[in-house]
Amino acid sequence: MEKCHERRLKLAEELKSCQKAFIALGDETRQQIIITLLESEVHGIRVGEITDKTHLSRPAVSHHLRILKEAGIVSMYREGTRNYYYVSAEETIWKQLGNLFSRINEIVDEISEKECSKSQIEIESNKDFI
């Protein structure tokens, strides 16, 4: 039982480390901005281009980009006075999310195996009543 509790604590810790990313990814408008960035040129696009493609106001796009940037999902580089935004290639947040989903998958598999075993035991014990 102790091992199970430790795994749940580790999962909670990993979930906390990904909270900003989940909040950022949980908004449909930000999802649309990410899709727009992924569909754009490799070098990134400017706020005005995102505004044109998403039909959002400049302040709205800037607000959502700030949240995505703070979450480590979007990066920006400056060329003169122009800012270009792109989906971040920094591995940290993507590795954290990948590790979290892997751990969730392991726990779900473990629970499924236990439920299958429990069902099998119930089937076996019900044979006595037939």
For each predicted feature, which ranges?
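Amphipathic alpha-helical dimerization/coiled-coil segments
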Residues: 1-18, 38-39, 88-130
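N-terminal helix-turn-helix DNA-binding core of bacterial DNA-binding proteins
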Residues: 16-57, 81-92
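Base-recognition residues in the alpha-helical recognition helix of bacterial helix-turn-helix
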Residues: 35, 63-64
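Alpha-helical residues within the helix-turn-helix
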Residues: 52, 63, 69-70
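Short amphipathic alpha-helical/adjacent loop interface patches that line ligand
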Residues: 54, 65, 101-104
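Small cofactor-carrier domains centered on a conserved lysine used for covalent cofactor attachment
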Residues: 57, 61, 76
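Beta-hairpin "wing" of winged helix-turn-helix
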Residues: 69-80, 86-88
